[in-house]
Every structure is written in C-alpha cells, then in structure tokens.
Amino acid sequence: MFKQHINSIDQFSHGLSIDINCDMGEGMLNDASLMPFISSANIACGYHAGNEDTIKRTIELALENNVAIGAHPSYNDRENFGRLSQSIALVELAELISDQISLFEKITNQMGCKIHHVKLHGALYNDCAKDALSSKIVAQTIQAIDPSIMLYGLSGSHSIKEAKAIGLRSVEEVFADRTYQANGQLTPRYLDHALIKDPDESAQQVLSMVLDQEIKTHDGTMIAVNAETVCIHGDHPEAIEIAKHLFTTLQQYKIEIKQP
C-alpha cells in the first residue's frame, strides 16, 4: 500500500523530527505502558471520559516520562465516548471548550506545570476540522485562556487554518492507526477498513507521511499532508504494539521523536 523505505534510511534521515501523541486518561489501563513511546499526551477532561483524579494521575505519568501535557476536550457525551456529532450553538461551543480547559488549567496550576497543547476529541475534532466558523471559535477560546497553548489539528483542515489566521500556534496532525479518505478526512469508524491494526502497515504509513509528505487513501488516491505530530489512539486494541514498533522504526531512520 505504501512506498517501502527499508533501503533508503540514510537518504532521508537527516534533520527530520516528529511528535508522537496519544489520547490518554480515558480508562484504557495502558497509559503507563504507552508513555515511554510518545512525546505528547492528550488527556481527557471529563466530558467523554475521565475525571479530576484521572487527569492528575495522567499528568503525573506524563511528567515522569518528560511527555508534553495536553487537554483533550470533547462534546459532553460520556455515553457515546464523545464520538457522535452534536448540533450546538457557537456560544455553547465556546463554553464547552472553556469549561474543560479551565478545569484542566486549574489542575496543572495546582501541580506546578502548564498546558502545552489542546487537541479536540472524537466527533468534536472531526466536526471542527470540516467547519471554519467552529474552528475559529475554538481557536479564539484557547487563545483567550492562554495564547501560548498550541492547537493540534488535522493536517490541512479548518482547525489549522483558523488557528493560523488569529496567530495561535497550530501543529498539523496525521494518524498512525487510521486510514484516510480522498478528501483528507479520516475514514469513519463504522467502516471495516477505518482502523489500521498491523504495526508494520502503521509504521509504513507514518514513514510515507513524514518522508514523502503524502498518504495513499483507501481508494488509491495520493493526497498531500504536513506531518508535525502523529497520533496513536490509546483505545486502539493494538495501541502498545503500534507505538513500540513506530518508535523503533523512527529510531532506525534517525527521525527524532520530540514534542513541538
């Protein structure tokens, strides 16, 4: 499915780096096992999963592993793990984001650390990626809380464009464990081919995005991407195996793993 880079390590390895982020604090019980293989953690803020105690415990794990601490806000929808779209007013969207980040910031202040980034979760992430006005509200809300916070968003999406438009630092995200559609969006989870389960296939997809700035979609279309951070979902059934293999593969290619 992807170009093979096994024989071209020296050719492409100079000066490249990538962040590896993972969604955490969601009750999957694998956070401690994943931490050594990532550089950024997106921690659930209580609306789709988690609570103040899990936020604190996950922040502690991140600090122990020198991993960047990020807030992972979502729709208020624990029943569906934040994975169903909701139609809400823009003022409600601003409050939704503000309430979750403010809680997270209160905890980081208590623990003597700072929020490095925000990454939206699930349906909220996908909805904003496709909608300029929602993305603008999200970026403005984050900037009003702390202009030094970065926004992680889908590469090439409205989330990135609207953050850049107001001067909020954005980090373009790609995915190690998901397939793509020709429009640059992730394949919906209800489709059988949405998840990548083979660690080697996942690593090859990431290499294609980092080394070639492109990805082959499920229908064979090649699309351009800008890979600044790559996501591994903590609730993926093969998350630990994918993370370990990707970490080792990037090291073999001398691609530095570091937070933005």
Predicted segment positions?
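C-terminal domain-boundary segment and adjacent tail
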Residues: 149, 241-260
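Flexible, glycine/charged-enriched surface loops at secondary-structure junctions
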Residues: 108-116, 213-224, 256-260
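Active-site-adjacent beta->alpha loops and helix N-cap segments on the catalytic face
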Residues: 31, 50-63, 129-136, 156-163
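Active-site rim beta-loop-alpha module in soluble metabolic enzymes
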Residues: 156-162, 166-214
